[in-house]
Amino acid sequence: MSQEKYIMAIDQGTTSSRAIIFNQKGEKVSSSQKEFPQIFPHAGWVEHNANQIWNSVQSVIAGAFIESSIKPSQIEAIGITNQRETTVVWDKKTGVPIYNAIVWQSRQTAPIAEQLKQDGHTKMIHEKTGLVIDAYFSATKIRWILDHVPGAQERAEKGELLFGTIDTWLVWKLTDGAVHVTDYSNAARTMLYNIKDLTWDDEILELLNIPKDMLPEVKSNSEIYGKTAAFHFYGGEVPISGMAGDQQAALFGQLAFDPGMVKNTYGTGSFIIMNTGDEMQLSSNNLLTTIGYGINGKVHYALEGSIFIAGSAIQWLRDGLKMIETSPESEQFALASTSDDEVYVVPAFTGLGAPYWDSNARGSVFGLTRGTSKEDFVKATLQSIAYQVRDVIDTMQVDSGIDIQQLRVDGGAAMNNMLMQFQADILGIDIARAKNLETTALGAAFLAGLAVGYWEDMDALKELNATGQLFKASMNESRKEKLYKGWKRAVKATQVFTQDDDAE
């Protein structure tokens, strides 16, 4: 009797690595998770030890096998999804990184980004990459490493060094250095990739003096890239056949295959991605244009808006203000509120993200009265998440010309029913919460499984992650717009306030 076969997804995140094994129904049968250390050499800098990331991945692969008694020979294929933009540069011969991985959040390369802006390259880089110039993306991180590690530029020019985002690093390690590749979605976040021509951009590479030989080959999101070296996968030589950055993997896991479909992951922040189909649409309102996924010879583009504070606002209520003891408790508090929604919390703790991009804004509260209760404050904080999502969704509709009919949601805060209902009300559209909230890992598994025929085609996937719950808008139009206008006034007032004494 033949053994049952499975797909393994490796989900390499900012604070931990996970391995999840899925069956043919898309159900999770085993998982393992391991955190790894964050490194903060200076204020605003965030780094990881790339070997510690690799060790954590090895550990969770073993953990997933041990928990389930599934053997490596039962894994049909491996899919990888990863924290995007985080940058590793390593020695081609020894495999040893020449510096820590510089993490997507790290601001140490901001002066390089500022110089590019001052030199007038904003328009050119936006038109080619779909991105705004920022330290967030990999390009400035590579330049920083080549500048700060003695001899690195010369070694890179001699072809002795390799660059990769975390997907590339993990495939290189799993194949024992045999394969140096990335995928469309990760390449699109480097600020070096021309997303229209689907090539590394020579003009930007020359501008930053980054040797092309360092860069991985760019592949589709679903094809066999190589096989695991047996000694790195507990005796199994298994195809690695799916790769995508975490937010794009979630888009795929949410089955958002058609233009106009949108997903929002409510994590620490919120990442809203809209499938715009085979047309690259540049935003005129500070959204990012990127590649959603490329499969079967066809690329699907996407618009992305990032909100800095979502789930972390609930953590602030719990840890900072001690208003609640657990995050799920926020729902009960909000439902107990008797306010008429006149309180507005603007959680601009680290500035405002899309579409404002105001790094100087700071958090504020409006509409307090003597009668305002703790419950009212918790409710207003939850509502702030939904208001920010509306800011981005409205902008997406303007940029794309597409009328959005539904928002597909996942992530921790998506479990909050009160928040999801208010989100539906303030948007005036349906909110579809996935039955399986593991959409990021599931997306990587789907991409890997399609490449090896584990699932026949994308239509077969549509049966596997049905909507768990649908929240329908029930608020009348005049109240919806009155509340949202109040939010816009609160944001405007927040941006006027400054802590700078010289601004008088």
UniProtKB/Swiss-Prot annotation:
Residues binding glycerol, per UniProt: R84, E85, Y136, D246, Q247
Binding-site list for sn-glycerol 3-phosphate: T14, R84, E85, Y136, D246
Pathway listed: Polyol metabolism; glycerol degradation via glycerol kinase pathway; sn-glycerol 3-phosphate from glycerol: step 1/1
The reaction(s) this protein catalyses: glycerol + ATP = sn-glycerol 3-phosphate + ADP + H(+)
Top-level taxon in the UniProt lineage: Bacteria
Listed GO CC annotations: cytosol
Molecular function per GO: ATP binding; glycerol kinase activity
Regulation of activity: Activated by phosphorylation and inhibited by fructose 1,6-bisphosphate (FBP).
Entries under Gene3D superfamilies matching the protein: 3.30.420.40
Residues with Phosphohistidine modification: H232
EC number annotated for this UniProt entry: 2.7.1.30
Keywords (A to Z) from UniProt: ATP-binding, Glycerol metabolism, Kinase, Nucleotide-binding, Phosphoprotein, Transferase
UniProt cross-references to PROSITE patterns, sorted A to Z: FGGY_KINASES_1 (PS00933), FGGY_KINASES_2 (PS00445)
Record note on modification: The phosphoenolpyruvate-dependent sugar phosphotransferase system (PTS), including enzyme I, and histidine-containing protein (HPr) are required for the phosphorylation, which leads to the activation of the enzyme.
Keyword Transferase in annotation: yes
Binding site residues for ADP: T14, R18, T268, G311, G412, N416
Biological process terms in GO annotation: glycerol catabolic process; glycerol metabolic process; glycerol-3-phosphate metabolic process
NCBIfam families on file: glycerol_kin (TIGR01311), PRK00047.1 (NF000756)
Function description: Key enzyme in the regulation of glycerol uptake and metabolism. Catalyzes the phosphorylation of glycerol to yield sn-glycerol 3-phosphate.
Family: Belongs to the FGGY kinase family.
Subunit structure: Homotetramer and homodimer (in equilibrium).
Protein name: Glycerol kinase
Originating species: Streptococcus pyogenes serotype M6 (strain ATCC BAA-946 / MGAS10394)
Taxonomic lineage: Bacteria, Bacillati, Bacillota, Bacilli, Lactobacillales
Gene: glpK
